[in-house]
Amino acid sequence: MTRLFLVRHCVPAGRDAAAPLTPAGQLQAIALADYLETLGVELLVSSPYARAQQSIAPLARRLGLPVEIDPRLAERVLSAAPLEHWREAIRRTFEDLDLVRPGGESSRTAMARGRAAIDALRARSVRGVAVVTHGNLMTLVLRSFDTRFGFQAWERLSNPDVYCLEAEAERVRVSRTWGA
């Protein structure tokens, strides 16, 4: 059985790809390492964004493991232009999975991208995997396994957050393990 820990990054100093963790986010990354260290993680995979890589760095150092970077785990781009009412725009993309704004990515496309990354990891012979990504993409990946995940689930995510996907053959059980 594969246990895949889907991790939302710790608190960042901004939203762009290069934004680092805040000092509070750095402390959260240490707490995240304390938690994940006990779960039999053998493989670390991260979004290319700095905040995701910095969130898993303390665990990588402790376990002496490299962090694989997978661009499919990057956050979903909602729009090329900043949106004044971005929260409402995200809500609408959970209602209409094919809605796409100029320069953006639909929920359906982002979900397929994230799910492809997860399926590739599930196909590997590893018992425990920590995968660090971002809130919107994480919720869409969770939705690909359980359609009850939507806008409200996205709103309830914390920084960091951890969901466990326990896979055996084609069956996957989803459970929140961080703060649960």
Q: What does each model-identified segment do?
A:
Residues 65-81, 158-161:
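A short, structured active-site edge motif that brings together acidic residues
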Residues 148-176:
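Domain-level recognition of soluble alpha/beta enzyme cores
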Residues 4, 125-136:
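Generic beta-sheet signal
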Residues 48-49, 72, 132-136:
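Short, well-ordered beta-to-alpha junction loops that form the rim of enzyme active sites
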Residues 58, 140-144:
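Active-site signature of alpha/beta-hydrolase-fold catalytic machinery across serine-
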Residues 2-69, 89, 98, 103, ...:
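Active-site-proximal alpha-helix that buttresses catalytic centers in soluble enzyme cores
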Residues 96-125:
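Internal catalytic-core helix/loop-beta-alpha segment
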Residues 81-92:
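Short, flexible, mixed-charge acidic loops at enzyme active sites
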